[in-house]
Swiss-Prot record:
A matching Pfam family: CLP_protease
Entry keywords, A to Z: Cytoplasm, Hydrolase, Protease, Serine protease
Annotated localization: Cytoplasm
Quaternary assembly: Fourteen ClpP subunits assemble into 2 heptameric rings which stack back to back to give a disk-like structure with a central cavity, resembling the structure of eukaryotic proteasomes.
Top enzyme category: hydrolase
GO biological process: protein quality control for misfolded or incompletely synthesized proteins
Protein name: ATP-dependent Clp protease proteolytic subunit 2
Keyword Cytoplasm: yes
GO cellular component, one term: cytoplasm
Organism (species): Gloeobacter violaceus (strain ATCC 29082 / PCC 7421)
Enzyme Commission code(s) on record: 3.4.21.92
SUPFAM superfamilies: ClpP/crotonase
Amino acid sequence: MSELANYGPGAIRAAYSGDYGFRTPPPDLPSLLLNERIVYLGTPINDVVAELLIAQLLYLESEDNAKPIEIYINSPGVAGFETSAFAVYDTMRHVRMPIKTICLGLAGGFSALLMAAGTKGQRMSLPNSRIILYQPYGGARGQATDINIRAQELLTTKRTLNQLLSIHTGKTVEQIDKDTERLFYMSPQEAVSYGLIDKVLEPSANKLAKLKAVGAPV
């Protein structure tokens, strides 16, 4: 079992005092981030990761269902059953607080869907990230009938994924089907044009000036 399983709301409650702040320093970095209403997805999505993300979202809603949260995403997509990612997506749509999503590094496949599922106007990416859309994939073993059942399930998953992407991007399902026949890479600016995100987070003018002053690439 991944050590991520230790980073749930139970760890938060152990250090939390009543309704006001931490009595002691948070027991781990994810708890510290959670105290600031920040959720970080930095691995492929599997059952354990999905369980953690869902628990964090529900916990934050129970804390304050109107106060915004931020989800930072650096993930290639699903490593396991696609139902784990759909469960996270459905939870994001279920909770009532505004959700800002920020891609840093990579948002691929189902992780790109989670990025696009943030609150409109609050879906963002850092400038050097990459976004990839691709079809669900998977292998199947066993009897021919079992392999056929799995193949049909993959087609159903693909159809559902593309329908959800269509909702969040404004693209037609047919267009997304065509675009994802092969790996479909996008820069953050291209992702804005595609409708996956709303803006690219560029360095501030002051920060750019400091970087140029020390000869750093910008």
